Amino acid sequence: MMTEATKVLYIVVREEGDDDDNNGDDSFRYTRPVLQSTLQLMGCKARHAFKISRRVFELIRSEGSCNTSPENGKEPEFAKEVGGSTCVEKLNCLVVAGDVDKNKSKPFEMYKRRTTVVVSREIFVDVVCDALAEYKYVGRDQRADLILACRIRERKESVTVLLCGTSGCGKSTLSALLGSRLGITTVVSTDSIRHMMRSFADEKQNPLLWASTYHAGEYLDPVAVAESKAKRKAKKLKGSRGVNSNAQKTDAGSNSSTTELLSHKQMAIEGYKAQSEMVIDSLDRLITTWEERNESVVVEGVHLSLNFVMGLMKKHPSIVPFMVYIANEEKHLERFAVRAKYMTLDPAKNKYVKYIRNIRTIQDYLCKRADKHLVPKINNTNVDKSVATIHATVFGCLRRRETGEKLYDTTTNTVSVIDDEHRNQCAANSLTSKGMFQVIQRQGSSRRFMALCNTDGTVAKTWPVASVGKIRKPVVNTEMDDGTEHQLHKAEPVNLQFGHFGISAWPSDGATSHAGSVDDLRADIIETGSRHYSSCCSSPRTSDGPSKELMEEQSVNGSDEDDEEGDDDFHEPDSDEDLSDNNDERNRDEIGSVDEESTKSDEEYDDLAMEDKSYWTDNEEEESRDTISMVSQNNHNEASKTNKDDKYSQNLDLFLKTTNQPLTESLELTSEYRNRMGVAASDKAKMRKRSLSIPPVGKHGSIIDDQILANQTDSVL
């Protein structure tokens, strides 16, 4: 009788040396969605994570298939044979007679046991690494990254991401997308904590708690606040000058004369800080509970003042803070239109617009605190870029935390490690914004190098790629390029964890700067045996991307009283030049927004898989993978620029003609352009949602411009 393969729905990963008497205390049960989220956490693209997780379950089902009967009382277990060619060799079906009667009364429990496979940690990691290799993922140490991601997913470690920022900067949207990307199900807003606290206090008893942060200063006593600040300032001056009669006289005179009231902007900041201090105590207790349970969480809110965040980091080592802001005031103001009842920017009908000066003042204050404490600042004009930057920075901090580094420096009251990791990510993204990655291998050599290729096809930088030894441990090639000419044997495209941000994991000191001409290499070329690897030297491209310079004043005392001194001279700048980046870079960033695919949930990738089978063959799917092809971009950019100018002139001439000519002539123009669009329309039918990166300029010109032109002629009809 023919037996059918076991259906695998669960993979139980058991630690080495864990026996059956532990009742699975050290084991963890993986499903496909859980494994997919784990792969996304370590930097795999969402669609690749979906397919890799499916591949892992297929490998386990195919390599360890056996016929299990309904009477089986325990899960099947994988055993690795010594000297086997594959990491999963056979599946042993363990039957325990004592559990048969007990499981008969639980039909679902019997089904779950039949579809569950127990594997050791080493075998599980080997299978996943093999699946990653099939999808051309190359990392500095993927095995360590996978183990780290598994520890986070299995709640053996935790991370707490704090998104600070004022109202309207996109913290809520960013936290939701970031939670989906990291696989974190707990996303908390400080507004919800404040709302919970309001249920214990009446509005008349505590009007400060019931006010919004941007006008909480209206509920403070200006005289009391001014006197309190004057006393703190005098106390600090007294401590710095020393105790002497002249200093005491000076301080006494200053105390009597510095009773003038604070400005409106300073009162707005004081009200914001007062309400934040009320909320931060409850947040402190919540973070303590989350860390005890090793539960990862994303916290966002305006109440995360950087002064109090530094105090939280002294107690909670899992915190990774970020400062989210909007540099462009006009775009910040436009975000508040959707919050009004009538979609208006009228201050009389939109309270956010009414208090926009207070909101911007609080943002400037937070940005100053972020620079002082070296907290990474995220200009959230492009949501996709912000999520990718935070994701790569968080995982980079987890890597460094695994090595024993402390994210918070108690001596300087700064987070220089997080800032350094963030600057590395920005530098990597800037370095590789126009680069292409391929793994190259020279003729007669077993060593492989990951090469960063420029747009003209020259190799700007190479890194030795780690190979896997007989014991399946990464072996890093330490031999460097000597600059001599070699024949290029192989060149294949690769995927990096976190995309272009992933290059930050490769040490810069281990890279070579020897470049060679590989203009004719394309992404689909595997064998190029006669290609020569020129020793023509070109220096690596240096990073000119946005990076936050180290502040001169790094020694900061962490008390709130010390931070009050800088608030006395606080004033809002007339322009946002100190907060904004380069105009060209800012305009480029603001083009992007939330991508259609970036908001997809894990379940929606089942539909994507169906689309893959319906519209694409295996060859087309392989060619459409997001690997970077070796195409000369210079010629392409020149052609696209010329075509764009020509299309613009044609569209303008057609528009002027169609506005004055009769209907019959418009019909002739419409049919003519529809005929020209025939080939382009047939090609466009094969396009998918995730092929947005394909340039619109092709053999027949700009598809986008032609479509607009067709719509324009249709409107004339």
Swiss-Prot record:
Residues 243-259, 532-545 have a biased composition (Polar residues). Disruption phenotype: No visible phenotype under normal growth conditions and normal levels of phytic acid in seeds. Residues 235-259, 532-629 are annotated as: Disordered. Residues 559-582 have a biased composition (Acidic residues). Residues 583-602 have a biased composition (Basic and acidic residues). InterPro entries: P-loop_NTPase. May be not required for the accumulation of phytic acid in seeds. Phytic acid is the primary storage form of phosphorus in cereal grains and other plant seeds. This is P-loop NTPase domain-containing protein LPA1 homolog 2.
